[in-house]
Swiss-Prot record:
WD repeat locations: 1-34, 69-114, 139-182, 185-225, 230-269, 317-359, 367-407
Gene Ontology BP terms: autophagy of mitochondrion; glycophagy; nucleophagy; pexophagy; protein localization to phagophore assembly site; protein transport
Subunit (UniProt): Component of the PI(3,5)P2 regulatory complex.
Motif L/FRRG motif positions after renumbering to this chain: 226-230
Protein name (record): Autophagy-related protein 18
Domain comment, as recorded: The N-terminus might form a beta-propeller domain involved in specific binding to phosphatidylinositol 3,5-bisphosphate (PIP2), leading to the association of the protein to the membrane. The L/FRRG motif is essential for the cytoplasm to vacuole transport (Cvt) pathway, for the recruitment of ATG8 and ATG16 to the PAS in nutrient-rich medium, and for its recruitment to and dissociation from the PAS under starvation conditions.
UniProt cross-references to SMART domains, sorted A to Z: WD40
Family that this chain belongs to: Belongs to the WD repeat PROPPIN family.
Region (Disordered): 267-310
Length: 414
């Protein structure tokens, strides 16, 4: 299995293999279409239509109509470098290369724009499923410093951009074809981003993977901050449910976290570390955002480390006392105390843990093969979470939305 993905409304699941691809419905789980031709490294579906975009070789993209037994090719394009990802909605096709984005009008496959990016080997990019809020999100390009010497004529051309050193995000209007805002989401480079169905919320995670943040789009206000854990782990996948009340997050830890999105305290979020409301932010906003993440991450890590090393329950450390207190403190008390603390420190007191989670089973032979990659989606038909693993397993877990806690395995397919 080369690749796996859900479509925009999580009703279909696409799998790319070295011998073609398969498309399944998720509820009930049935194979809808397949092709046994080509080495498919990635694919994207357009909702529940018969249109599928395929990457058949590192540089070749094919748009196919899967209706009927004979799949017809609508168009085929070859790019200068390897295709790392594709994004689709009813208006746009975005092709992600390592240092470029190609944006097409999906109605006639006319290329509208090419955007230069910083090196983006992990294809960090999200396109809204909504045609009205048609936003494209990717890491803010960072210009390289001017060369101090003239390279020899035979040397290959150097990129105008360098790899990002922080988690700044560009919000791009894919209808008007213009940048509209910038979010300073994290101090570390990004590892994963996800948009909700309406194109109004953006979830972000950095390479540390300890803090998940949710911003409003396009005004870039920080609405929620969640803590996945204290130990850094790479975030593989994030997904909102259809009503944007839940956010699921999978990582290299084999635990899938589910966070509840209640009514955000926007006035406080805005005053603490909201993103800039214009394309250029002030130096004060930059400093505040980065300082808050540093303190929040360091607080969580030091607390976990001290609690783990302290083995004398009759003489608890100050850190372990704070840890227990923070788990039981009420929301009203946290909000009151937060009002008197500096903005960077106030975020520590916010109750931001997951309310539910599931444990992804591992096969016995996978223990020495490193972390199992997972892709997650929340079902539109009930309180369930769907998880697909790089081992080729598809799991459906039931989640208790009232009590939370650990979800139970409901179905499993291989």
């Amino acid at each position: 299995m080369n690749f796996v993905t859900f479509n925009q409304d999580h009703s279909h699941l696409g799998v790319g293999t070295s011998n073609g691809y398969r498309v399944y419905t998720t509820d009930p789980f049935n194979k809808q279409s397949e092709s046994r031709e080509g080495d498919v490294s990635s694919l994207e579906m357009l909702f529940s239509t018969s249109l599928v975009a395929l990457t058949l070789s590192p540089r070749v993209l094919r748009i196919q109509n899967t209706k009927g037994k004979r799949h017809s090719t609508i168009c085929e394009m070859t790019f200068r470098t390897a295709i790392l990802a594709m994004r689709l909605n009813r208006k746009r096709l975005v092709v992600v290369l390592e240092s470029e984005l190609y944006i097409y009008d999906i109605s006639n496959m006319q290329m509208l724009r090419t955007e230069k990016t910083s090196p983006n080997p992990n294809a960090i990019c999200a396109l809204s499923a909504s045609s009205e809020n048609n936003y494209l999100i990717y890491p803010l390009p960072t210009k390289a410093a001017p060369a101090t010497f003239q390279p020899p004529s035979h040397a290959p051309p150097k990129s105008d951009h360098i790899a990002p050193t922080s988690g700044e995000i560009l919000i791009y209007d894919a209808t008007k074809m213009e940048a509209v805002n910038v979010i300073e989401a994290h101090n570390s480079p990004l590892s994963c981003i996800a948009l909700n169905n309406d194109g109004t919320l953006l979830a972000t995670a950095s390479e540390k993977g300890t803090i998940i943040r949710v911003f409003s789009i396009p005004d870039a206000q920080k609405l929620y901050q969640f803590r996945r854990g204290s130990i850094p782990a790479r975030i593989f996948s994030m997904s909102f449910n259809s009503t944007s009340t839940l956010l699921s997050v999978s990582s290299a830890t084999e635990t899938v976290h589910i966070f509840r999105l209640g009514a955000p305290n926007t006035s406080r979020s805005n005053s603490i570390s909201s993103g800039p409301t214009t394309l250029l932010s002030t130096s004060h906003q930059r400093s505040s955002s980065r300082t808050s993440e540093d303190i929040s991450d360091e607080f969580g890590s030091s607390t976990a480390d001290m609690a783990a090393s302290e083995r004398k329950p009759l003489n608890p450390t100050f850190a372990s006392m704070i840890r227990r207190t923070s788990q039981t403190v009420g929301k009203s008390f946290a909000a009151t105390v937060g009002g008197y603390l500096p903005s960077a420190v106030a975020e520590i007191w916010e109750p931001s843990r997951d309310f539910a989670w599931v444990k992804v089973p591992r096969s016995p032979n996978a223990a020495s093969a490193g972390p199992v990659r997972t892709v997650v989606a929340l079902s539109n038909n009930g309180p369930q979470i769907m998880v697909v693993t790089s081992e080729g397993n598809y799991y459906v877990f039931n989640v208790d939305l009232e009590k939370g806690g650990e979800g139970t395995l409901y179905k499993q397919y291989s």
